[in-house]
């Protein structure tokens, strides 16, 4: 199970190198190498949703072929899942690639969507209210200190609003349109990333705390994050939501329980994993 960073895939088609050959994707190649050496019954790989359509499907085709020929070979399938459909209060679309080793008579089925859709308010509204720069006794529930200018700007943005709510003379003239917005309390959160400092709480004038972001990602409160505030945000933003991972794991368990294994098809030319 893994999510190797694949920074090179976004530019690979423009620089004359294939996805596999791009040095920036060395950790992906290492993932394939480990699958070939260890030959697990199944593997799961998660990555950004854009991988499914990059270069009109050429990139994902290359990835599937790499796993199909790894070791004894794998039956590979992929799908783009939205975490909001699996008990996570967040619109987060990610590709999930699953392989079953050749010789195992089984099929993997992606989890069915759950009926309930959670809003951001559902999962963080019970936490203590904080003003800019305030702290609390709850681990990782510490509010960022904002400047007076930033507090003035965010004060104009309504629940679910954006930078267009800010008077023109104060409105940022450039920058990411996904910033200077306020969460919509009636919807799942926007996708959590490693930098959420300019997206505001739906009713409090501040950015979300690390604990609030962790709850949106579906981490339990007893999971404590360590590091600087930026490091913690990156840890949370780069994570796979635990509730989504759980639903996938249940399907993996079912596929393994139903699978009949032919050990004779194992690839015998294994090398030691260094």
Give the location of each predicted region.
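Short, functionally important structural connectors and interaction interfaces within domains
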Residues: 1, 73, 78-80, 112, ...
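Proline-centered helix-kink/hinge sites
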Residues: 4-5, 40, 89, 220, ...
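C-terminal target-recognition/interaction regions appended to catalytic cores
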Residues: 134-274
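Redox-cofactor binding/interface segments in oxidoreductases and associated redox assembly factors
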Residues: 1-2, 45
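Short, conserved beta-strand segments within well-ordered enzyme catalytic domains
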Residues: 1, 10, 193
């Amino acid at each position: 199970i893994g999510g190797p960073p694949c920074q090179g895939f976004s530019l690979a088609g423009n620089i004359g190198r294939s996805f596999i050959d791009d040095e920036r994707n060395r950790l992906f190649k290492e993932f394939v190498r480990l699958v070939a050496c260890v030959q697990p019954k199944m593997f799961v790989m998660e990555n950004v949703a854009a991988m499914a359509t990059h270069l009109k499907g050429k990139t994902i085709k290359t990835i599937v072929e790499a796993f199909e020929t790894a070791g004894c070979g794998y039956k590979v399938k992929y799908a783009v899942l939205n975490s909001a459909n699996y008990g996570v209060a967040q619109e987060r679309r990610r590709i999930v690639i699953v392989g079953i080793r050749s010789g195992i008579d089984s099929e993997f089925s992606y989890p069915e969507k759950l009926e309930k859709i959670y809003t951001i308010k559902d999962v963080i509204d019970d936490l203590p209210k904080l003003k800019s720069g305030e702290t609390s006794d709850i681990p990782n529930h510490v509010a960022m200190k904002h400047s007076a200018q930033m507090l003035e700007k965010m004060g104009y943005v309504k629940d679910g609003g954006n930078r267009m709510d800010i008077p023109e003379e104060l409105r940022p003239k450039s920058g990411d349109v996904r910033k200077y917005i306020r969460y919509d309390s009636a919807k799942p959160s926007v996708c959590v990333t490693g930098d959420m400092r300019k997206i505001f709480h739906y009713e409090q004038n501040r950015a979300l705390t690390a604990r609030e972001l962790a709850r949106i990602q579906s981490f339990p409160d007893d999971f404590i994050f360590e590091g600087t505030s930026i490091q913690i945000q990156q840890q949370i933003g780069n994570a796979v939501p635990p509730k989504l991972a759980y639903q996938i794991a249940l399907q993996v368990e079912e596929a393994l329980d139903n699978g009949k294994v032919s050990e004779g098809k194992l690839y015998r030319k294994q090398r030691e994993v260094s």
